Amino acid sequence: MKDIVKAMLLRGTNVLLARRSSRPRNYPDRWSFPGGHVETGEALDDALVRELQEEIGLTPLVFWKIGEIIEPNPSINGDVLYHMYAVNAWAGGKPSIVGDEHSEIRWFSIHAACALQHLALAEYVPILRKLL
C-alpha cells in the first residue's frame, strides 16, 4: 500500500484547499489538500514538510496527524493510505502554487469546504468536521 500525506492548513476557522490541475488521471479538477507520496524510507512528518515546500512553498512548523483514509477507489489511484494532518503554523509567508500539480488554491470556511461538490474524496468531510 502506498502512503500519501495531506495537509489541512488552518487559518482561524478556514482551511486551505488546492484544486488539482486537469492533467492527472486521478481526481482531475477536484478540490483536495496539498501533499503527496511518501518516499521509500521517509518518515511521514518529513514527507509532509517536503511536499508542502514543493507544492505551496511553505514549511509547516506546528502540525499533528488528524486521521487516515483508505483510498475508496483503488481502480483510480491504486491501494493508498492517506495520512491527514492539520497544520496551524508555518514559515514562508502566504501559500502559493509551485509547479503544475494545482490550478488554484483558496481558503474556505470549514463548513463551506464540507459542502463542496467537487472534493477529490468525500471521505475528507468527516475529518474536516473534526476541526470544528
PLM feature spans:
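Conserved N-terminal beta-strand and adjoining loop/helix that marks the start
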Residues: 1-16, 37
